Amino acid sequence: MTKIYLSAFLMSVVTSFAQIPQGYYNSATGTGYTLKTQLYNIIKGHNSKSYNALYTCYQTSDRDYFYENDGTILDIYSEKPDGPDFYNYSATVTGDRCGNYANEGDCFNREHLMPQSVFNEASPMVSDAHHILPTDGKVNGMRSNYPFGIVSNPTWTSKNGSKLGNNTTSGYSGKAFEPIDEFKGDVARCLLYFVTRYEDKVANWNHAMLNNTSNQALSNWFKNILLTWHNQDPVSPREIARNNAIYTFQGNRNPYIDHPEYVAMIWGQALATDTFDALASVTVYPNPSNTNRISIQSEKALDEITLITLNGQVLQQIKNPTGNQGTYTLENLPQGFYFVKMAAENQSTTRKVIIN
């Protein structure tokens, strides 16, 4: 579908419906995995609905009022952001729902971004609308239970460009499924919600996307992909509208749509893979700093130092910095939480710092 850019009036309407309930995140005061646990306590205990009730939810949560604006099902596996869709489904016509299918365009069903087999189809995960999207049945079947990933040489491609093939990033080389760029951030935030909402259970589940812990929850390779997608594809009006509709439906919210900055506050920034040998011994001190200044000690001469805010904004970038016997100093830093990214010999590492 041809994308419709929101007018100032329509954006004001979207914003008016996007107000977070007063006080909803008042207890989200920490950082790191402490913040993640605080969010878990906020969003747990939602009003779990039946699996079949998802089709009722989709009538308000997943209608296309953002591309062709025709009210059909907005399916991330078939949507064509810059042109006409190959097929559409009605949110209210039961005959558009699967049953049997053989080809794309036959019917749509309910896609668990975290596969049901991971949690043995148990409630409330099996019907949690925040991670279950209406998608074409054929594409959903091709995605199967594979993790999401980066696919350079697909063995199968959907009509909108979603790809199935071997993952090409370091850490996992098995089959993976890659959605189109338009919806990568959406997928990332759904899955970050999932591992937060089910923090009390996720350590017991096995899948290539998970690492059997309750804190980080995600495998290192997959965490890096989700953080990259989150940064590259910011929260959209479609996600805001969906978050509000699901809040009405089941009584909890996706915090990473309401507060995208929480992602970096919990999991940090996406890091380049294969990047730590030359900088293994780098230290940043004092941390926290009470003097608006930090020092960096590195055995390797640094090629670049970048200071990044928690929402990904580059505050300072120093190329070929001057050090004194391996010590580099950043001064006059404003109060806040930051990431310091240091590069040397085509490698990089990142540290979180606090300026009081």
Please annotate each region the language model reported.
Residues 7, 277-356:
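C-terminal outer-membrane/trafficking sorting elements
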Residues 73, 81-107:
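Short, His- and charge-rich active-site/binding loops that engage polyanionic ligands
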Residues 98-109, 113-270:
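Domain-level detector of nuclease and nuclease-like folds
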Residues 89-92, 125, 129, 207, ...:
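Short, polar loop/linker segments at the starts of domains and inter-domain junctions
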